[in-house]
Swiss-Prot record:
Its main location: secreted. Glycans are attached at K101, K915. Expressed in bones. Residues 321-330 have a biased composition (Gly residues). Type I collagen is a member of group I collagen (fibrillar forming collagen). The modification 3-hydroxyproline is found at P693, P971, P986, P989, P992. Trimers of one alpha 2(I) and two alpha 1(I) chains. Residues 115-131, 149-167, 215-254, 374-400, 462-489, 522-535, 592-606, 619-646, 675-691, 720-729, 739-754, 816-831, 885-899, 933-966 have a biased composition (Low complexity). This is Collagen alpha-1(I) chain. The keyword Protein biosynthesis does not apply. Residues 169-181, 648-660, 804-814, 849-864, 984-999 have a biased composition (Pro residues). Residues 65-79, 900-914 have a biased composition (Basic and acidic residues).
Length: 999
């Protein structure tokens, strides 16, 4: 006969012809005596009598925590209970026929030997066959049921209760806290499991309710761009002889903007820094003073049932019991291991052919085989004709317009011009002469002492964005920061009106094939669900093959290498519940959490005298769950208890509140629009049919012949605007757009009338520094006055490195300078302004009549005048050569979402690939050990709202999800009114027995 092997339960077995009955086996060896029964644990004490619970008394004044009482002496161990009866020894059963080798059973708990079962019916004697080889000894039978615990011994006498410490004097009342700002009311979190009640902390005086907080802004503005690096400050020349103040020159036209340089290569990514060491746990602060107890709050919701407690320690083994009488006959033992195959006997004469048996039941389907090797990819078929263009879908809503982008970085300051020669003492003004040629720049003078700081100048025009700098080396990893408090939930902004849908562009010609890309990038975000495909024709089902005979079991081969994990197989039927496994070892103690904030240090009271133990009072009402206490010291590991029954699945937790809306990123540059292709012919719109119910998915049939190309349908009516979809992933920043053309310079203003220079007055005494006046409007440039005599050549200073000259702009028409205004009183010293770009050099004036005067003594440096306006922005210099490729920088945060670009042209439809064969379902692997729960990651910022995706098909109902993490504790709500006194509750459960008292 063919046996049934559970390890190959999936195969189909074919019943073979019945073989001749073998000889009756010899009686098996006597069974091993059962193990010694465990002594039962001591009996539980009787339940104390319960009476009706009286009303709760008024709360007494809070007292300080008294000093720890003296530890009670260990109680005497209880008397050992009488030994339980010993199970009867079973009679030896008859040895069964050698069966197939069964799988190894789970090791159960050693229990007392069970009662022997009734003897089986005697088999009919079979025809004498050849004597087989003696079979091997059968495996050890499954352990019997665990013996019942013996009668419990008498309970030990209850020890005296320890003396209760005297209540300390009440601590001082803490000062009333300032009224807090009420935050947004947090969503009600799922009630977590009721924790152990911790020690009551100090209760401060209730603060006054604060005013309602203002509504949050719609969203913060984008971060301002980083200022460009200022250029190198030129050396200050030696203070020369103060010359006559020159007239400001006319403002020249701005030159054309230079082309932008190519972006530099992306640097390599730096090595990650070493993780910082975890900081030491802070010391536990002393408990603060106990505040005045407030009125009792409303009764909280009933907490969930706590987790099952750890099993108690196993009692000491009792003395061996008396030997019991013989028990009833035990159940027959398990089949023994199959013996070695005996030598083949002589072939007997064939017997008469028996009648044809009835067909047997169909065997179980075999297990799915290993997945076959992946077939070779076939050659691509010829491209089929283009399919019909479907009707256009409804236009999606335009996204909300993003806020303006951050200002670009400030451009670098232009090259500092060389200072001109200082003029000598002003002579008698001569008649204005003709304009002479421009003189050469003099050498720079020696660096003078730094002057007082001038007032801060106005902010200059926005410079062009600088090229990105090289990626710096990664800094060392800092210590882990403390977790911040959860921020208040912002007010959701108003949803903007949907913009009009843009017209669809014409299809452009396909572009040339691009170069081969680099390494594969990171996997992208999961895309939205596509539209359901067309249902294929069901294929023909093949004929089932005949099941082959079951072969002999081969020897176990060497263990192969671990294969690749297969796909998730079809879930099998739920098997029977196996015997309970051995209890696992207790897990390691987790790391201690961060210590909470320390309360104010209270004054330590003097320890009171030890009072007499009072009678136990009635059990009070169940108070609200207290805060979690500090983790206690790790105790000694107890004996492993028996595995409890699996509890029912908890209810599904409520859906958490939506997270705060993240900041809307700044719009990126608008991409270039592609070239338009030739427009196609417009077809007639087809009639829209009724949408039928979706049918069952059939097997994919063979691809049909390509159909004719249909005409393009007309544009359908615009559908209703759907609700906004979930926020999409932030797309990569688009390429920068081309620079616009620079406008032409404006015409010069009218020339002012020339003024007559007045005589030079006598220098007055230096006045007191007055308050800085308000900055007046800039006047028109005046006419040029007579130029002074040229000054003597100053000492040459150290020449600085000259930067690359920028392109020279077209010279502007110089207007006539106006007359010099009176010197105003010096203003207060302000902060130094930024270095402005050098203005255009004026023409050199004529030399006036008269001999040059002797140089005057250098006067005291005058007060710094008001800072002038920033000059015109210099032209952008040519792009320098590309520097060496730096190390690749770490991946930066996602950039702001750019504006929605124009809809690209629809590319040509690609060839339809050959449908691959469906892979075999892999064998279901063994369940791995449960991983340790990871830490909860920080909440990510919510992205901007993306367009609504197509409606997906209804998915199968998922399993009940686990309870979500409890939400953050919301701010305290307003104080509720005092409720009516409730009815007296039922008596509480009896408390745990107290510790044994001293003997």
């Amino acid at each position: 006969s063919y046996g049934y092997d559970e390890k190959s339960a999936g195969g189909i077995s074919v019943p073979g012809p019945m073989g001749p009955s073998g000889p009756r086996g010899l009686p098996g060896p006597p069974g091993a005596p059962g193990p010694q029964g465990f002594q039962g644990p001591p009996g539980e004490p009787g339940e104390p009598g319960s009476g009706p619970m009286g009303p709760r008394g008024p709360p007494g004044p809070p007292g300080k925590n008294g000093d720890d009482g003296e530890a009670g002496k260990p109680g005497r161990p209880g008397e050992r209970g009488p030994p339980g009866p010993q199970g009867a020894r079973g009679l030896p059963g008859t040895a069964g026929l050698p069966g197939m080798k069964g799988h190894r059973g789970f090791s159960g708990l050693d229990g007392a030997k069970g009662d022997a079962g009734p003897a089986g019916p005697k088999g009919e004697p079979g025809s004498p066959g050849e004597n087989g080889a003696p079979g091997q000894m059968g495996p050890r039978g499954l352990p019997g049921e665990r013996g019942r615990p013996g009668a419990s011994g008498p309970a030990g006498a209850r020890g005296n209760d320890g003396a209760t410490g005297a209540a300390g004097p009440p601590g001082p009342t803490g000062p009333a806290g300032p009224p807090g700002f009420p935050g947004a009311v947090g969503a009600k979190g799922e009630a977590g499991p009721q924790g152990a009640r911790g020690s009551e902390g100090p209760q401060g005086v209730r603060g006054e309710p604060g005013p309602p907080g203002p509504a949050g802004a719609a969203g913060p503005a984008g971060n301002p761009g980083a200022d460009g690096q200022p250029g190198a400050k030129g050396a200050n020349g030696a203070p020369g002889i103060a010359g006559a103040p020159g007239f400001p020159g006319a403002r020249g036209p701005s030159g054309p903007q230079g082309p932008s340089g190519p972006p530099g290569p992306k640097g390599n990514s730096g090595e990650p820094g070493a993780p910082g060491s975890k900081g030491d746990t802070g010391a536990k602060g002393e408990p603060g003073p106990t505040g005045i107890q407030g009125p009792p709050g409303p009764a909280g919701e009933e907490g969930k049932r706590g987790a099952r407690g750890e099993p108690g320690p196993t009692g000491l083994p009792g003395p061996p019991g008396e030997r019991g009488g013989p028990g009833s006959r035990g159940f027959p033992g398990a089949d023994g291991v199959a013996g070695p195959k005996g030598p083949a006997g002589e072939r007997g004469s064939p017997g008469p052919a028996g009648p044809k048996g009835s067909p047997g039941e169909a065997g179980r389907p075999g297990e799915a085989g290993l997945p076959g090797a992946k077939g070779l990819t076939g050659s691509p078929g010829s491209p089929g004709p283009d399919g019909k263009t479907g009707p256009p879908g409804p236009a999606g809503q335009d996204g909300r317009p993003g806020p303006p982008g951050p200002p670009g970085a400030r451009g670098q300051a232009g090259v500092m011009g060389f200072p001109g020669p200082k003029g000598a003492e002003r002579g008698v003004p001569g008649p204005p002469g003709a304009v002479g040629p421009a003189g050469k720049d003099g050498e720079a003078g020696a660096q003078g002492p730094p002057g007082p700081a001038g007032p801060a100048g106005e902010r200059g025009e926005q410079g062009p964005a600088g090229s990105p700098g090289f990626q710096g080396l990664p800094g060392p990893a800092g210590p882990p920061g403390e977790a911040g408090k959860p921020g208040e939930q912002g007010v959701p902004g108003d949803l903007g009106a949907p913009g009009p849908s843009g017209a669809r562009g014409v299809q452009g010609p396909p572009g040339p094939a691009g170069p081969r890309g680099g390494d594969a990038g990171a996997p992208g975000a999961p895309g939205s669900q596509g539209a359901p495909g067309l249902q294929g024709m069901p294929g023909e089902r093949g004929a089932a093959g005949l099941p082959g005979p079951k072969g002999d079991r081969g020897d176990a081969g060497p263990k192969g290498a671990d294969g690749a994990p297969g796909k998730d197989g079809v879930r099998g039927l739920t098997g029977p519940i196996g015997p309970p496994g051995p209890a696992g070892a207790p897990g390691d103690k987790g790391e201690s959490g961060p210590s909470g904030p320390a309360g104010p240090t209270g004054a330590r009271g003097a320890p009171g005298d030890r009072g007499e133990p009072g009678p136990p009072g009635p059990a009070g009402f169940a108070g609200p769950p207290g805060a979690d206490g500090q983790p206690g010291a790790k105790g000694e590991p107890g004996d492993a208890g028996a595995k409890g029954d699996a509890g029912p699945p908890g209810p599904a937790g409520p859906t958490g509140p939506p997270g705060p809306i993240g900041n809307v990123g700044a719009p990126g540059p608008k991409g270039a629009r592609g070239s338009a292709g030739p427009p196609g012919a417009t077809g007639f719109p087809g009639a829209a049919g009724r949408v039928g119910p979706p049918g069952p998915s059939g097997n994919a049939g063979p691809p049909g012949p390509p159909g004719p190309v249909g005409k393009e349908g007309g544009k359908g009516p615009r559908g209703e605007t759907g609700p906004a979809g979930r926020p999409g992933e932030v797309g990569p920043p688009g390429p920068p757009g081309p620079s616009g053309e620079k406008g032409s310079p404006g015409a010069d203003g009218p020339a002012g009338a020339p003024g007559t220079p007045g005589p030079q007055g006598i220098s007055g005494q230096r006045g007191v520094v007055g308050l800085p006046g308000q900055r007046g409007e800039r006047g028109f440039p005046g006419l040029p006055g007579p130029s002074g005599e040229p000054g003597k050549q100053g000492p040459s200073g150290s020449s600085g490195e000259r930067g690359p000259p920028g392109p020279v702009g077209p010279p502007g028409l110089a207007g006539p300078p106006g007359e010099s205004g009176r010197e105003g009183s010096p203003g207060a010293e302000g902060s130094p302004g930024r270095d402005g770009s050098p203005g255009p050099k004026g023409d050199r004036g004529e030399t006036g009549p008269g001999p040059p005067g002797a140089p005057g003594a250098p006067g005291a440096p005058g007060p710094v005048g008001p800072a002038g306006k920033n000059g015109d922005r210099g032209e952008t210099g040519p792009a320098g050569p590309a520097g060496p490729a730096g190390p690749a920088g770490a991946r930066g945060p996602a950039g702001p979402q750019g504006p929605r670009g124009d809809k690209g042209e629809t590319g040509e439809q690609g060839d339809r690939g050959i449908k691959g064969h469906r892979g075999f379902s892999g064998l279901q692997g063994p369940a791995g050990p449960p991983g340790s729960p990871g830490e909860q990651g920080p909440s990510g910022a919510s992205g901007p709202a993306g367009p609504r995706g197509p409606p997906g098909s209804a998915g199968s109902p998922g399993k009940d999800g686990l309870n979500g993490l409890p939400g953050p504790i919301g701010p305290p709500g307003p104080r509720g009114r005092t409720g009516d006194a409730g009815p007296v509750g039922p008596p509480g459960p009896p408390g745990p027995p107290g510790p044994p008292g001293p003997p």
